[in-house]
Structures are given as C-alpha cells and as structure tokens.
C-alpha cells in the first residue's frame, strides 16, 4: 500500500511499488493498492482496505474490481491506525458486488438480504458539472456507454448537478485529514511506542511525498480554527447538499466515473502524470471524483465498467444517501448484471 495510506499510486519507497494486477507495468492505485492487486491476481478471493478519500474505490477501479466504501461509522475501526477519525473507514475490495455485500454483512452485522432491483423506472442522478469534467477520452466514452445501457434498461437518468460541490470539497477535505493526522499519530505513538517521538517517525518515512505531507501536518499546517470550521460548518453544509439532492431530484443514487483517467505507467517519480497531453498533479487528478462522497460520509461503490483501448480497467461509481448501504449494494448488483449481459 502507499506509505501511511497517504497517496494513490502505492509507490512505496520503503517496500517498493505495487504493480497493477491487470497491467503490471502500470500503477496499482492506492492507497490500498496491494489489496487490489492481490485480488486481481487471484492471490486472494477478496480483501479489506482503508478508505479516506478513495483508497478502496480507486485501486478497485484501476484493477477491474469492485470497491465499496460504506457510510462512515458503519464498520468498527478497531485494528486500524487512523489518519482521520472523521473520514476513515474500512472497505471491501472484491470481484463481484455479491462478494462485497457478503463482506459488508460480516463487517457491519447487517444481515438484511439485498432487494432485487428492477432498473425499469429507477431514478439515477447524473451530475455532469464537476464529476464529468475533463475526462480521459476512454473514460468518457466508456461511461457514456454505461449510461446508454442503463437508459435502454429503463433507468431514468436525471441530469442534475450538486451545488458548489467542488468548492465545499476543498474546504472540507485536507483541513480535516491533515489536522486529525497531527493529533492521531502522536496519540498512537504515545500508546503503542512511547520511546519513538513524532519527529523520529517523520524522519523514518521513506516516501518523499508522504514525508512532506506528514511533516507539514505535524508542523501545524492547519490551524485549529480552520479545522473546526471544516468539520463543524463546511462538512454539514456538504452533507446537506447531498441530502437535498437525493430528496429533491428523487434519485436513489448518483453515477459518475470513479476516476477521470486510467492507470498510468509506473515510474520512480509519480508526482505528475500525463492527462490529455498535459502533465498534471497525480493525487488531486485521481481523487477528484471519489473525495466528495468520502468527505460527506456517504456510501459509494465502484464497479467495473469496461476497459480502455490499451486494456486498462475503467470503473464507474455509485454514491447513495447516508445509511442506504444495503440498498446501494442492491442497485450496484443490478447495474453490474446489466453491464455484463451480452447484447
């Protein structure tokens, strides 16, 4: 995985880069890239990763798998070393939605059976602004094909946008995770390894990108008042935007590309990647679509949607209202079936 779960390539300077399970010369995604690759290469039937801003769904998408992030708080966090108690959750990475639903049942204790969903008349939101902007050409064509198939099955695609979602996401995401990391890592050391100081921990981080982020967090990059505004004001506003959207548009889920671009070739320095002919920052480019739902704490699931012209997996994500986990899994299962049916 990416060191300390702080990245999306799984290029780990301490243990080496994780290879993509479908195209080994390409990045696995992250931060739970090792889990995804193990499942993709049949080393495991399923796995459990951690998801702060996309770390389960993103590597699942890039490896042709299913990745499920539950409503925050649905699963116990015992055994996890948290970097954000507000945002972190465990999540299954599997080959099928049914397997993800089984692990959800085990992890949550919710053994309610999945409803049989008829796509005919099912209302699904399509938020074009933000989520569909600036896509890799293969991703764009694949997702449009998915929407066409769903429409042909009778699903009602509601073209409506989430108000100010990008702006709210910026105000919530990094302020919360960086501040909480600055509190949680020292507390972890004090409890489990009191002989190691925070400064010593930071000095031992092998990955330069992670060391820079964690060092900034520990140095107080996020003032407490900014954190409290993000957690207590901006995040509730963001949650209200989602709740209002689901209610006012009468949709049970929203659908969008899990990532705006496919996996890129592995290289030593992955601070930037090629995206539509330009070098762009890797981290924000990949988490753009997975991050908002994470910050709002709502459930999201990435399922395989197809492959690029190079054979690289492409995922499509479904997000649902807070607490609708089993319903969202049932909807995902119905869409998975529709996408795998031969014409």
For each predicted feature, which ranges?
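Active-site loop/turn elements of alpha/beta-hydrolase fold enzymes
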Residues: 1, 162, 305
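Short glycine/serine-rich loop/turn segments
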Residues: 1-90, 127-129, 256-278
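C-terminal core of ALDH-fold dehydrogenases
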Residues: 13, 289-290
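Short, basic, helix/turn surface patches
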Residues: 18-32, 73-80, 182-196, 283-287, ...
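A generic structural signal for residues located within well-ordered alpha-helices
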Residues: 33, 95-98, 288
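Structural helix-boundary/capping segments
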Residues: 41-47, 52-133, 140, 144-153, ...
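Amidase signature
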Residues: 106-287, 295, 337-343
């Amino acid at each position: 995985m990416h060191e300390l779960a702080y990245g999306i390539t799984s290029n780990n300077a301490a243990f080496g880069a994780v290879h993509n399970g479908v195209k080994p010369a390409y990045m696995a995604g992250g931060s739970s890239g090792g889990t995804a690759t193990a499942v993709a290469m049949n080393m495991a039937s399923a796995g459990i990763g951690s998801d702060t801003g996309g770390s389960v769904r993103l590597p699942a998408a890039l490896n042709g798998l299913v990745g499920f992030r539950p409503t925050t708080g649905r699963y116990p966090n015992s055994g996890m070393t948290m970097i954000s108690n507000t945002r972190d959750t465990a999540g299954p990475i599997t080959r099928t939605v049914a397997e993800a639903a089984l692990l959800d049942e085990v992890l949550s204790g919710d053994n309610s059976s999945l409803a049989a969903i008829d796509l005919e008349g099912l209302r699904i939101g399509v938020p074009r602004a933000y989520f569909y902007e600036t896509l890799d050409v293969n991703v764009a064509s694949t997702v449009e094909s998915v929407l066409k198939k769903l429409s042909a099955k009778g699903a009602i695609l509601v073209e409506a946008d989430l108000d100010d979602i990008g702006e709210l996401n910026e105000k919530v995401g990094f302020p919360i995770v960086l501040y909480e990391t600055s509190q949680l890592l020292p507390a972890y050391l004090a409890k489990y390894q009191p002989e190691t100081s925070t400064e010593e921990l930071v000095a031992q981080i092998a990955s330069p990108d992670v060391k820079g982020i964690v060092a900034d967090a520990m140095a107080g990059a996020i003032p407490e008042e900014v954190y409290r505004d993000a957690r207590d004001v901006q995040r509730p506003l963001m949650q209200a935007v989602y709740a209002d959207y689901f209610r006012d548009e009468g949709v049970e889920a929203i659908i969008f590309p899990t990532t705006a671009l496919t996996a890129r070739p592995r290289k030593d320095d992955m601070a930037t990647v090629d995206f539509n002919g330009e070098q762009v920052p890797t981290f924000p480019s990949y988490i753009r679509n997975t991050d908002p739902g994470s910050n709002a704490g709502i459930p999201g699931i990435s399922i395989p949607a197809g492959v690029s012209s190079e054979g690289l997996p492409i995922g499509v994500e479904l997000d649902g209202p807070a607490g609708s986990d089993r319903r969202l899994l049932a909807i995902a299962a119905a869409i998975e079936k529709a996408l795998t049916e031969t014409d």
